[in-house]
Amino acid sequence: TGWEAGTEMAALRRLVNYWGSGYDRRAQEATINALPHRRADLDGTPVHYLRFDGEHPDALPLVLTHGWPSTFLELVELARRLATPTRHGGSADDAFTVIVPSLPGFTFSPQRPSLPPAAPTHELWHRLMTAELGCTRYAAHGGDLGAGVTTMLGQSHPEAVVGIHLLAVADPVDVDPGSITAEERAYRAAVAAWFDDDGGYEHQQMTRPVTLGYGLSDSPVGLLAWLVEKYRAWTDSDGDLSRRFSDDFVLTQASLYWFTNCISTSFRPYYEYARGMREPLSRVTVPTALAVFPHDLSQPPRSWAERSYHLTRYTRMPRGGHFAAHEEPQLLGDDITEFFRDLR
């Protein structure tokens, strides 16, 4: 009983029963179909994305990148706020034209060919923003896996990326142990403790993703159990997921994974990272903001981020968790807006 060993049976049974009789799949499909979907072919790699045009003629282009276990759907409310700020009490001068791509292997973006030689995701995003959409300057935001993509955009293309806004940061390389502060040591210890207690999923997805994928691709109940445990644990919900995610939202997320058969391919970034199939991190020189939500997986101190990034803004949020764009779109949207206001 309870959630200590994983997804609680009673909670899962209730969701499964609603999924089978009560959940209006057609209504959710209609909502998804009404979104501004686009598709690009980037040198043979198809990429799905949403485009929300900014309400100002000089709106700054902004690419938002989701993480795991997320989809484009999680970013819709945030994107709307950023594209049309006057509808939410803001100024049209702060508008962005917002691009929300689906990561390769997630929902409507098929998995890339095995790496190498396929282009890494951040290079696909740069092609999307420049060659496909014609942007010469653009901004970027991401959390979780999306923070990694956004970091690499800032590192690789400072000539085009005006700044990056992150919900997580990469660990610095070649840290002198003698330079680590007490606050940084406490942070690293907290991360290690979290991994020991809650990181089993990550180890499995890093090491044997295909084996796990067979089971989750064969059972919608198993897939839902794998996802909902993370949604409950990683939100600022005090154990009551319905405070943050409605049943319809949870089941629509699960349905997107199920009907596009993408759960196995969504593990691919973990496998690639574990095998060094990513470009190494060097110092990111573009202006960087970090927003730290108290119920996210980790809360890096400012000094830790400053080791690898040109950090010009650091915000400790009063509430919110790992899925900040859906949990707290106003808090996150305001922080993004304020950060990029002087970088336009």
Q: What are these regions, as identified by a protein language model?
A:
Residues L73, H88-G90, D94, I99, ...:
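Glycine-rich "HGGG/HGxG" loop immediately N-terminal to the catalytic nucleophile
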Residues P69, P104-T107, D171, G321:
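Alpha/beta-hydrolase active-site loop signature
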Residues Q205-R344:
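C-terminal subdomain of alpha/beta-hydrolase-fold enzymes, centered on the catalytic histidine
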Residues R81, P85-R87, E132-E184:
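Conserved hydrolase catalytic core segment
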Residues S114-E132:
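Alpha/beta-hydrolase active-site loop
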Residues A59-G67:
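Short beta-strand element of the alpha/beta-hydrolase
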Residues T1-D58, F249, W258, T265-E279:
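Non-catalytic accessory segments flanking enzyme active sites
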Residues W68-R80:
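The serine-hydrolase catalytic nucleophile loop
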